Amino acid sequence: MPNPSKILKHSWNKEDDTLEFLAKPFAEDQSVTKRTILSYLGAIYNPLGIVSPTTAQGKHIYRQACDKKKGWNAEVSGELRDEWIKRTKQLKTVEIPRSIATLIGEITGVHFHLFADANLACYAAAVAVVEQKGSMSKGLLTSRSRISKRNSSIARLELVSGHMAANTAKNLHGALQTLVHQFFYHLDGQHGCAVLAD
């Protein structure tokens, strides 16, 4: 990478003006245990939420390993091991534009689009978008994800994901200290919308 610098511990490629998430590779010959999974997940620094979807999947794998009730240093099943190796490989290719506004010029409006979704494994939220005069620039501002609580209904999890999206937008709005003209909420399922309608 030419002229790399760091922004929030992410590598900044100044020529392409992109941020690249640099994860420590997980050696395929390394033992995959509850201890090594938790250690790897704990070492991931992800303040922008760039890799939240992948870390959520890693946490789900950890939960599945815990369900087997094996010791901390016991090898996980072959299926979980293969899934873990697959997910950690995904972390090597994450790269996003550093700036959402791609044109030099006045920003005429900022619109937050909040996307929320949930399933029985996890729920997540993401926030995007900026508008400039004469064009629309779109990009991911941040994302968050959590492992779903056990025995929760889809309707409840969709509401929780929508609430997380709203809280994320509120915190982001305060941090940016800029006027947001509109907020758009996109819930991916009908369960949460039906509950809100009632």
Feature names for model-found ranges:
Residues 2-106, 111:
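C-terminal reverse transcriptase regions that engage the nucleic-acid substrate
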Residues 131-160, 164, 193:
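A short, polar/acidic, helix/strand-boundary loop motif
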